[in-house]
C-alpha cells in the first residue's frame, strides 16, 4: 500500500478544496492512504511543505494541488514557474516522487474550476511513481 502526503494550497479554495477531495478519492480508489495533509496559503508555499513530507519515512510520495489563475500582470507565470522548479528540486533532493497537481498559469477562475480533476491526476501519478520506483 502506498502512503501519500498531500499538500493543498488554500488560495482559490473554491477550486483547490474540490481538487483535494478528488485527490483523496483517487487515493482511496487505488488503495493508497494519505498519512498527512498539509494546508498552505498558496501554491508558491507548497515546496517547503512538500519537502517536510518527503523527508518522512512513512511517506512514499507527495501530491501537491493548487490553482494559479491569471491576473493583470505576469505574476501567475512567475509563481507557476518557481513552484514547479522548486517541487522538482524537492523530488530530486529527497528521492521521493512529488507530483504537480497545480492548474495554471494563464487561466481564469472558470477555467480552473474545469480542471478540478487535476487533483485526482496528481494523486494517481504519485501512486504510480511510488509503485514503479519502489
Curated annotation (Swiss-Prot):
It comes from Halorubrum lacusprofundi (strain ATCC 49239 / DSM 5036 / JCM 8891 / ACAM 34). The active site is at 75 (proton donor). GO terms for cellular component: riboflavin synthase complex. Catalyzes the formation of 6,7-dimethyl-8-ribityllumazine by condensation of 5-amino-6-(D-ribitylamino)uracil with 3,4-dihydroxy-2-butanone 4-phosphate. This is the penultimate step in the biosynthesis of riboflavin. Keywords: Riboflavin biosynthesis, Transferase. Its EC number is 2.5.1.78. This is 6,7-dimethyl-8-ribityllumazine synthase. PANTHER family: 6,7-DIMETHYL-8-RIBITYLLUMAZINE SYNTHASE, 6,7-DIMETHYL-8-RIBITYLLUMAZINE SYNTHASE DMRL SYNTHASE LUMAZINE SYNTHASE. One of its GO terms (molecular function) is 6,7-dimethyl-8-ribityllumazine synthase activity. Gene3D superfamilies: Lumazine/riboflavin synthase.
Amino acid at each position: 500500500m502506498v502512503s501519500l502526503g498531500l499538500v493543498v494550497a488554500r488560495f482559490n479554495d473554491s477550486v483547490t478544496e474540490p481538487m483535494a477531495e478528488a485527490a483523496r478519492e483517487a487515493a482511496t480508489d487505488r488503495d493508497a492512504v494519505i498519512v498527512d495533509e498539509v494546508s498552505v496559503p498558496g501554491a508558491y508555499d507548497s515546496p517547503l511543505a512538500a519537502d517536510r513530507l518527503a523527508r518522512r519515512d512513512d511517506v512514499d510520495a507527495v501530491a501537491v494541488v493548487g490553482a494559479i489563475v491569471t491576473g493583470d500582470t505576469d505574476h501567475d507565470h512567475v509563481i507557476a514557474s518557481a513552484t514547479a522548479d522548486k517541487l522538482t528540486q524537492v523530488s530530486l533532493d529527497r528521492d521521493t516522487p512529488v507530483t504537480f497537481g497545480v492548474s495554471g498559469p494563464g487561466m481564469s477562475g472558470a477555467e480552473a474550476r474545469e480542471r478540478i480533476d487535476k487533483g485526482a491526476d496528481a494523486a494517481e501519478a504519485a501512486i504510480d511513481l511510488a509503485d514503479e520506483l519502489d
